[in-house]
């Protein structure tokens, strides 16, 4: 029996594509352009897992489809290769992170090529290549020139075990680091910051212009966190000092019964009374050990200490105590809040815990029992009494401005981006600090500032990066004899990934980041597919840099990615015992359809779970390609379910996809192909072209494959196959199973050319309609025959056809036909006696 011999066919076509540069990006000015982008991977030592190809296959299907539709297609791949794991490996083994990275890239590339993706490898980029990061550094120098890159003494999330500070986004809810799970402490350090806040409003508004999942847009909106309210100034009793709070509800100011400052607030030490000094100092120390996430966790008990000082509520002159509490962050808002415990859950809990006043200023609820957080008419609020929320806010803001104690203010949750890392394996920041106190950017003609090779890459221990140990590189002298020291911090991994999609457009340009005309031709990216875990950070950072480059006149569009799609997660299988503990797959055996612990014999429950090394349930694509073939893996991952759903990996599903490809191979290599169309497959073929085309456009790959299966089933029922339909079908399956399609195409067309650029099939609308229908013939109410007749046949004609049928004649022999009821396109009912 003939079958698809993947071990022979797949390497053959991969070699053909590489040799012929089949997927070189088209540059025909007459054709439209299509840019399909994958989130490029970090080349880890573990290599690809089966989750990677899901997104890659989706963009590959679109790329192959668009080439066949006559587009120039840009479909590139590269490597996000700076980052902590390579550095950690180098520290553990004494090897150079560059060598480790190069080996990993070679392995990733081998695996990717084995899956038949149609990348244009002439455009490969690597963020650790000096010819690439020259332009990462160039962008930084431009940010610096425009005042958007600046140094500040900021409390950072310091991870002792990693020897570096990490961004807020890299701290887990339990207060440990995302990488390694190490404790995170807050400590002030000199850091480079990027002023992403200058773009907050545009980052928010321009989300309206892109075709992204609403859930991702919402995550970005929440991260930017725009709120309109007022800044209110509180004077501190018996001093000339004051502080400002931002509130979205200035109308509740009459209910403010205490104020809270962040433990790090500048005023804390100077306003604390002698009696409270010790308690305040100890509380500040404890707060410094917690991450922002741990501090703001709503589920934890509130803690705080009174400073001994009082503020004056500007609206009624009342003295209110000033506390410090770690749920107020110095980095958020003004680092100070006014507390209205009657109408805010956190303030209410705090007030109850420490016996502070609770004064209701909105009607409704019993604030002794619980805070009232709904809207209501104002009470206990002097000139606001009886007003609703909108009226009261407007009136209070006017009062604050009139009395010089506040003004309307728009605030954002978004903070400036902490851009420095105290590590070796990253882009050097191209800044020199001179002994006269000035700093300058490295001039453009001296870029790239190359990362020096060194075997000593342990953190310096001083909070500086290992580059601080490299004196020859570190120390420089200006022409006028002034000595300087290079910046020792390096950029975060996010830097290179914030603009890589631009370099793919013109990867070998030595003169500029990319040519303007080429950027105009290819931007914005038509489709960007990757994991939802990058919803906020990578996408927000890339949008920020893109907008900055737009302002410089470097890029022609306001947004980088027109359409974004997040593929779901491919889950592994996990097993749990009766206590709910997870059992590694190599300790599990299957008996009679159930699963048992090999050592204890206990029956286990099977459930999907994220693939992980510890559970030993990670599936390696190399093994799948070896056993089933790359086309099977591609078809299976697209057929598992909707592209954005998270679905459990299944060996049975893989086998099913393999059987389907074998059936396709058999159909097209053993069925007699004829030049004359019998018309039997007209409807199903045209339906298949229509459905597959529309569903590829809509990224509904699972239902496109289901339609291909319907065609194969229908074609197998016929004795012969019309050759044009055979060719059309092979073209339709080519984006999903390209190796198989190339092989079958040579059998059909025998041109020696790839199927990749053969024009995509079209369908005939008129053939989508049935010209014949099946009707049933009933005698005495029972179905005795099924007949195929012309559609819309008149009742009298229908009756003739039914009565002439042999089966029907045999059934009514010797009986009298009393009446015949004919319903066109449905049935003929014969009444006999």
Swiss-Prot record:
A motif ('HIGH' region) lies at residues 41-52. It catalyses: tRNA(Leu) + L-leucine + ATP = L-leucyl-tRNA(Leu) + AMP + diphosphate. PROSITE patterns: AA_TRNA_LIGASE_I. The keyword Cytoplasm applies. CDD domains: Anticodon_Ia_Leu_BEm, LeuRS_core. SUPFAM superfamilies: Anticodon-binding domain of a subclass of class I aminoacyl-tRNA synthetases (SSF47323), Nucleotidylyl transferase (SSF52374), ValRS/IleRS/LeuRS editing domain (SSF50677). One of its GO terms (molecular function) is aminoacyl-tRNA deacylase activity. It is found in: Cytoplasm. Keywords: Aminoacyl-tRNA synthetase, ATP-binding, Cytoplasm, Ligase, Nucleotide-binding, Protein biosynthesis. Gene3D superfamilies: HUPs, Isoleucyl-tRNA Synthetase, Domain 1, Valyl/Leucyl/Isoleucyl-tRNA synthetase, editing domain. GO terms for cellular component: cytosol. It is an enzyme of class 6 (ligase). ATP binds at residue 613. The keyword Cytoplasm applies. Its EC number is 6.1.1.4. A motif ('KMSKS' region) lies at residues 610-614. GO terms for biological process: leucyl-tRNA aminoacylation. Belongs to the class-I aminoacyl-tRNA synthetase family. PANTHER family: LEUCINE--TRNA LIGASE, MITOCHONDRIAL, LEUCYL-TRNA SYNTHETASE. This is Leucine--tRNA ligase. It comes from Streptococcus suis (strain 05ZYH33). The gene is leuS.
């Amino acid at each position: 029996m003939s079958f698809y011999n993947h071990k022979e066919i797949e390497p053959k076509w991969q070699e053909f594509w590489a040799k012929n540069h089949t997927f070189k990006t088209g540059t025909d000015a007459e054709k439209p352009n299509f840019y399909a982008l994958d989130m490029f991977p970090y080349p880890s030592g573990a290599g690809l897992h089966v989750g990677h190809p899901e997104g890659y296959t989706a963009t590959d299907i679109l790329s192959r489809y668009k080439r066949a539709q006559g587009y120039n297609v840009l479909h590139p791949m590269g490597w996000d290769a700076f980052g902590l794991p390579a550095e950690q490996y180098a520290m553990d083994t004494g090897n150079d992170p560059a060598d480790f990275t190069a080996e990993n890239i070679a392995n990733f590339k081998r695996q990717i090529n084995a899956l038949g993706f149609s990348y244009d490898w002439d455009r490969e980029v690597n963020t650790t290549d000096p010819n690439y990061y020259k332009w990462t550094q160039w962008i930084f120098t431009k940010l610096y020139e425009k005042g958007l890159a600046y140094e500040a003494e900021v409390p950072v999330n310091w991870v002792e075990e990693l020897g570096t500070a990490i961004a807020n986004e890299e701290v887990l809810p339990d207060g440990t680091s995302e990488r390694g799970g190490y404790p995170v402490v807050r400590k002030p350090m000199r850091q480079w910051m990027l002023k992403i806040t200058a773009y907050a409003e545009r980052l928010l508004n321009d989300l309206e212009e892109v075709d992204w999942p609403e859930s991702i847009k919402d995550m970005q909106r929440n991260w930017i966190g725009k709120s309109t309210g007022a800044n209110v100034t509180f004077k501190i009793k018996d001093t000339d000092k004051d502080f400002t709070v931002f509130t979205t509800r200035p109308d509740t100011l009459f209910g403010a019964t205490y104020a809270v400052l962040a433990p790090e607030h500048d005023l804390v030490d100077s306003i604390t009374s002698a009696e409270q000094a010790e308690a305040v100092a100890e509380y500040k120390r404890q707060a410094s050990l917690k991450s922002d996430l741990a501090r703001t966790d709503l589920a934890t008990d509130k803690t705080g200490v009174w400073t001994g000082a009082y503020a004056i509520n500007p609206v009624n002159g009342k003295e209110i105590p000033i506390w410090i509490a770690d749920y107020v962050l110095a980095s958020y808002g003004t680092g100070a809040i006014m507390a209205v415990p009657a109408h805010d859950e956190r303030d209410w809990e705090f007030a109850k815990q420490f016996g502070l006043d609770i004064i209701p200023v909105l009607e409704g609820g019993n604030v002794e029992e619980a805070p009232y957080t709904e809207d209501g008419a104002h009470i206990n609020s002097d000139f606001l009494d009886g007003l609703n929320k909108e009226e009261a806010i407007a009136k209070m803001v006017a009062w604050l401005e009139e009395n010089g104690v506040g003004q309307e203010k728009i605030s954002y949750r978004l903070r400036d981006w902490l851009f420095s890392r105290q590590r070796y394996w990253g882009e050097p920041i191209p800044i020199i600090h001179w002994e006269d106190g000035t700093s300058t950017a490295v001039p453009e003609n001296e870029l790239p500032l190359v990362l020096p090779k060194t075997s000593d890459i342990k953190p310096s221990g001083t909070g500086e990066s290992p580059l601080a140990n490299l004196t020859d590189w570190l120390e420089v002298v200006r022409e006028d004899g002034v000595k300087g020291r290079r910046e020792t911090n390096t950029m975060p991994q996010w830097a290179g990934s914030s603009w890589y999609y631009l370099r793919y457009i013109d990867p070998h340009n030595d003169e500029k980041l990319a040519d303007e005309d080429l950027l105009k031709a290819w931007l914005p990216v038509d489709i960007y597919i990757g994991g939802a875990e990058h919803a906020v950070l990578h996408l927000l950072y890339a949008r920020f840099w893109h907008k900055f480059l737009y302002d410089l006149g470097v890029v022609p569009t306001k947004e980088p990615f027109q359409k974004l799609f997040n593929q779901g997660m491919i889950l592994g299988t996990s097993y749990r015992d009766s206590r709910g503990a997870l059992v590694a797959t190599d300790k599990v055996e299957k008996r009679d359809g159930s699963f048992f612990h090999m050592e204890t014999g206990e029956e286990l429950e099977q459930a999907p779970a994220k693939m992980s090394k510890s559970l030993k349930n990670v599936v390696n694509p190399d093994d799948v390609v070896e056993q089933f073939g790359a086309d099977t893996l591609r078809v299976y991952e697209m057929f598992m379910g909707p592209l954005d759903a998270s679905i459990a990996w299944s060996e049975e599903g893989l086998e099913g996809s393999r059987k389907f490809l074998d059936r396709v191979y058999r159909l097209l290599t053993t069925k007699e192909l004829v030049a004359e169309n019998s018309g039997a497959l007209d409807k199903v073929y045209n339906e298949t072209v229509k459905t597959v085309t529309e569903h590829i456009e809509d990224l509904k790959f699972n239902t496109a494959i289901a339609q291909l299966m319907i065609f194969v089933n229908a074609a197998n029922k016929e004795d012969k196959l019309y050759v044009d339909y055979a060719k059309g079908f092979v073209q339709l399956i080519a984006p999903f199973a390209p190796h198989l399609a190339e092989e079958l195409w040579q059998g059909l067309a025998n041109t020696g050319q790839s199927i990749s650029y053969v024009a995509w099939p079209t369908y005939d609308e008129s053939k989508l309609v049935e010209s014949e229908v099946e009707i049933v013939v009933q005698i005495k109410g029972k179905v005795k025959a099924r007949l195929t007749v012309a559609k819309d046949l008149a009742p009298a004609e229908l009756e003739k056809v039914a009565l002439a049928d042999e089966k029907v004649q045999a059934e009514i022999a010797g009986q009298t036909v009393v009446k015949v009821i004919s319903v066109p396109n449905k049935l003929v009912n014969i009444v006999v006696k």
